[in-house]
């Protein structure tokens, strides 16, 4: 998105209702990556999970997948899948695999476990499978051990390890990718 702010699909929908077009919802980012920001309700009001589904439905209705023909689609959702709405991308057939990216911080491990439990709960229904865990290092004590234990608890593997770098935080502050 080249450091530009993105309007969320929910905000655009609330303004335009039926006149929402694909070009309104998408932004071409670095090296042709197509970006979409679903958005959410005012904190304390509404259902964020329902907002995610509405955004996914609008992308489908406007032919996003046929227009852009993406090689891969990534959904970056919160780890708080206690609300069933956050598991909707996998339950509605929008995801084949779930990859959990977590650090060894206790709350991150807890969120990762919640995601893994949600995937397990739907395992017999033919929804998305757990594809593994990626360690996003924060350099906390016993980090690798804790993430490995999480993987073992859910019969999966640690499939990648990201090194902690302040460059990631700097890029995020600028609204850019690390590669930019």
Put a short name on every predicted segment.
Residues 1-38:
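N-terminal phosphate/diphosphate-binding loop that engages ATP/GTP or pyrophosphate donors
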Residues 10-13, 157-164:
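Beta-strand->loop->alpha-helix junctions that form or flank phosphate-binding loops
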Residues 16-20, 56-57, 80-81:
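Short gly/ser/thr-rich secondary-structure transition/capping motifs
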Residues 34, 51-58:
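Membrane-embedded hairpin module used as a gating/binding unit in multi-pass transport
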Residues 39-50, 106:
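Flexible beta-alpha connector loops of hexameric P-loop NTPases
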Residues 43, 164-170:
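A short acidic, often aromatic-flanked loop/helix-cap motif at beta-alpha or helix-coil junctions
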Residues 54, 61-72, 77-161, 170:
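Conserved catalytic-core segment of NTP-binding enzymes
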Residues 172-180:
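C-terminal boundary of histidine-terminating zinc-finger modules
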